[in-house]
UniProtKB/Swiss-Prot annotation:
It is linked to Metabolic crises, recurrent, with rhabdomyolysis, cardiac arrhythmias, and neurodegeneration: An autosomal recessive disorder characterized by metabolic encephalomyopathic crises, hypoglycemia, hyperammonemia, episodic rhabdomyolysis, susceptibility to life-threatening cardiac tachyarrhythmias, developmental delay, intellectual disability, and mild diffuse cerebral atrophy. This is Transport and Golgi organization protein 2 homolog. It comes from Homo sapiens (Human). It is found in: Cytoplasm; Mitochondrion; Golgi apparatus. Keywords: Cytoplasm, Disease variant, Golgi apparatus, Mitochondrion, Neurodegeneration.
Length: 276
């Protein structure tokens, strides 16, 4: 289970406003090996964490490049998985390394969507000169990707804006933090968004999660139904905040669990300006 909240306004009126505010949780088995967010050794334009699971090495769930390409992935909750399907993390990696625009890329992905287990993919081209474009495709929804209009969105392990109770609850908390964003110092805004991502209040009952997840989700429903998931050996292990201001200055903050220890976390921040 993962969750993403984001607000984008390609041309904010105020100089103090942000073009993009994104807050995301990665929920995964604590034992699954991965690298913390960093610029890639073989491509120092791209910043992301990396999956190091055998056979899935190099995939990722969220990343951004200095050229303004951004992508984020969530899995679609389904009771049965096809273990022969392609690894979904490659969808983000491929976009970050290609020169293809976000909509064209998602159109190509949509032609191959049947080769993967369920997923949702956000792809964006952030350009100070041309204006920002953010697109969405889910392979369990409509056949064609869509270009998103400016606004605030929530995405978990169903289709975009599916009203799971935890998504609605978290989105409201996110909106409250975002509404104060212009008046807050950047570090205070980041701290407020991290508080949103670490809210463990279960939003029950939620028939929508039960219906979609079936028997698979029943034993863990009370844990899955919170923005921040806490189960034995599985749960929220990475929080990521991405801010892009009116001038194209990016602040990328990642807070990650270390050594499978809930009491041990590391926070790292990267800042750069998008290539126009």
């Amino acid at each position: 289970m993962c969750i993403i909240f984001f607000k984008f306004d390609p041309r904010p009126v105020s100089k103090n406003a942000y073009r993009l505010i994104l807050a995301a949780n990665r929920d995964e088995f604590y034992s699954r090996p991965s690298k913390l967010a960093d610029f890639w050794g073989n491509n120092n334009e791209i910043l992301s964490g990396l999956d190091m699971e055998e056979g899935k090495e190099g995939g990722t769930w969220l990343g951004i490049s200095t050229r303004g390409k951004l992508a984020a992935l969530t899995n679609y909750l389904q009771p049965q998985l096809d273990w022969q399907a392609r690894g979904r993390g490659e969808l983000v990696t491929h976009f970050l390394t290609t020169d293809v625009d976000s909509l064209s890329y998602l159109k190509k992905v949509s032609m191959e969507g049947h080769l993967y287990n369920g997923f949702n993919l956000i792809a964006a081209d952030l350009s100070t000169a041309k204006g920002d474009v953010i697109c969405y495709y889910g392979n369990r929804g409509e056949p064609d990707p869509i270009v998103l209009t400016p606004g605030t969105y929530g995405l978990s392990n169903a289709l975009l804006e599916t009203p799971w109770r935890k998504l609605c609850f978290g989105k409201q908390l996110f909106l409250e933090a975002v509404e104060r964003s212009q008046a807050l110092p950047k570090d205070v805004l980041i701290a407020s968004l991290l508080d949103v991502l670490n809210n463990e209040e279960a939003q029950l009952p939620d028939p929508a999660i039960e219906d979609q997840g079936g028997e698979y989700v029943q034993p863990m429903l009370s844990k899955y139904a919170a923005v921040c998931v806490r189960c034995p050996g599985y749960g929220t292990r990475t929080n990521t905040i991405i801010l892009v201001d009116a001038d194209g200055h990016v602040t990328f903050t990642e807070r990650s669990m270390m050594d499978k220890d809930l009491s041990h976390w590391e926070t790292r921040t990267y800042e750069f300006t998008l290539q126009s």
